[in-house]
């Protein structure tokens, strides 16, 4: 039941991606990106809906062609989450998706043509209240910057970002956020630190091309964890060579671990040893799968013996401490008379968690109604 995060977040300006507030103290938004062919409307819509079910706040969709732009129009009509169109080189695509209700444009102003083309996109974004994300990547720096620095460095990524920021500044456009992603953790972290000291706009965090589900999650947790612990970051994406749904789950787990944004259950479980009185690993794995639909913030401790179990249970919403044949049960840190049969642990604990979540949700609804009165 540790609710308050000690992290003091960096002050940033406020923008909106659709109805999602970004920056200026708003909850850190979790983003993902589709990996389907955008022209395959059905597959893309299905993937976005799967992302919606696990709580994604914003979804980015690559729009490389005019055919993809036409598909984007149909996709936008069938989903509820705000969509970001990822566009490079052809400014006309940006203008087209703006007509189709895009919620944010991910462009680099410097690579979509001459100043008149940049101005036309920015003017369109301003007229339609569409924010822009400047997305700098260590693997695609401008040729002159590559030649100047020889390799991607934090200073190189900063210079690239500021080049695009300056373009928007000259056009008096301030509704934008910026990212400076790299696949190397140290490079990305230092680049974001430099950028955070230079601008007030919201920052979108990510370790790009982080790797597969396991290695990429570890890299992202380290890199983003460092930045978030320093108060840097307003949106994030976990870039994995895996199902995008996993990106969202890992993103929320990172925020949950830092007590920045709670969504769903935070399981506290021991790694097990010969003292365990029930199958801790099997119990945790089963409950994680069964309870994915629970979004109520809760700390659930599942400890196999009495060495650490009671202590963890004291600071948990619900807790189980392993005992011989039957295990002790705690609610809000208080030991209950009821004990769980170790063989029926999973079903019994699932029922208790669901009941507690419903009760907490109802209490929150009552509190909100009282405040509104």
Curated annotation (Swiss-Prot):
Amino-acid positions noted as binding [4Fe-4S] cluster in the UniProt annotation, renumbered to this chain: 270, 273, 305, 312
Presence of the UniProt keyword Ribosomal protein in the record: no
Cofactor note: Binds 1 [4Fe-4S] cluster.
GO biological process annotation, one example: terpenoid biosynthetic process
Transmembrane residue ranges: none
Listed pathway(s): Isoprenoid biosynthesis; isopentenyl diphosphate biosynthesis via DXP pathway; isopentenyl diphosphate from 1-deoxy-D-xylulose 5-phosphate: step 5/6
Keyword vocabulary terms for this entry: 4Fe-4S, Iron, Iron-sulfur, Isoprene biosynthesis, Metal-binding, Oxidoreductase
EC code(s) of this entry: 1.17.7.3
One Gene Ontology MF term: 4-hydroxy-3-methylbut-2-en-1-yl diphosphate synthase activity (ferredoxin)
Top-rank lineage group of the source organism: Bacteria
Keyword Disulfide bond: no
Cofactor: [4Fe-4S] cluster
One Pfam family in the UniProt entry: GcpE
Catalytic activity: (2E)-4-hydroxy-3-methylbut-2-enyl diphosphate + oxidized [flavodoxin] + H2O + 2 H(+) = 2-C-methyl-D-erythritol 2,4-cyclic diphosphate + reduced [flavodoxin]
Family: Belongs to the IspG family.
Reported function: Converts 2C-methyl-D-erythritol 2,4-cyclodiphosphate (ME-2,4cPP) into 1-hydroxy-2-methyl-2-(E)-butenyl 4-diphosphate.
PANTHER family documented for this protein: 4-HYDROXY-3-METHYLBUT-2-EN-1-YL DIPHOSPHATE SYNTHASE (PTHR30454), 4-HYDROXY-3-METHYLBUT-2-EN-1-YL DIPHOSPHATE SYNTHASE (FERREDOXIN), CHLOROPLASTIC (PTHR30454:SF0)
Name listed for the protein in its UniProt record: 4-hydroxy-3-methylbut-2-en-1-yl diphosphate synthase (flavodoxin)
Organism: Serratia proteamaculans (strain 568)
Encoding gene per record: ispG
């Amino acid at each position: 039941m540790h609710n308050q995060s000690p992290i003091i977040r960096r002050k940033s300006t406020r923008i909106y991606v659709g109805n999602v507030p970004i920056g200026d103290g708003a909850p850190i938004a979790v983003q993902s990106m589709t990996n389907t062919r955008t022209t395959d409307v059905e597959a893309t819509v299905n993937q976005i809906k799967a992302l919606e079910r696990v709580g994604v706040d914003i979804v980015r969709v690559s729009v490389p062609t005019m055919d993809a732009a036409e598909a984007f129009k149909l996709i936008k009509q069938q989903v509820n989450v705000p969509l970001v169109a990822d566009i490079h080189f052809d400014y006309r695509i940006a203008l087209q998706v703006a007509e189709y209700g895009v919620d944010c444009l991910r462009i680099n102003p410097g690579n979509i043509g001459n100043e008149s083309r940049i101005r036309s996109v920015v003017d369109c974004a301003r007229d339609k209240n569409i924010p822009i994300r400047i997305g700098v990547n260590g693997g695609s720096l401008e040729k002159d910057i590559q030649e100047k620095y020889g390799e991607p460095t934090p200073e190189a990524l900063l210079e690239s970002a500021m080049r695009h920021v300056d373009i928007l500044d000259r056009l008096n456009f301030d509704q934008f956020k910026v990212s400076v992603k790299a696949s190397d953790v140290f490079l990305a972290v230092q680049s974001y630190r430099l950028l955070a000291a230079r601008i007030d706009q919201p920052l979108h965090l990510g370790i790009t091309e982080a790797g597969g589900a396991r290695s990429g999650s570890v890299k992202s947790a380290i890199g983003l964890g460092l930045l978030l612990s320093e108060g840097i970051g307003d949106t994030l994406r976990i870039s994995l060579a895996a199902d995008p749904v996993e990106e969202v789950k890992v993103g929320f787990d990172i925020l949950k671990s830092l007590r920045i944004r709670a969504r769903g259950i935070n399981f506290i479980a021991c790694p097990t040893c010969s003292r365990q009185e029930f199958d801790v690993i099997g119990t945790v794995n089963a409950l994680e799968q069964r309870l994915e639909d629970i979004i109520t913030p809760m700390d659930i401790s599942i400890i196999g013996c009495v060495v650490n179990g009671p202590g963890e249970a004291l600071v948990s919403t619900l807790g189980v401490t392993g005992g011989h044949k039957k295990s002790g049960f705690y609610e809000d840190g208080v030991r209950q008379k009821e004990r769980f049969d170790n063989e029926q642990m999973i079903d019994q604990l699932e029922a208790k968690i669901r009941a507690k979540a419903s009760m907490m949700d109802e209490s929150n609804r009552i509190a909100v109604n009282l405040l509104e009165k």
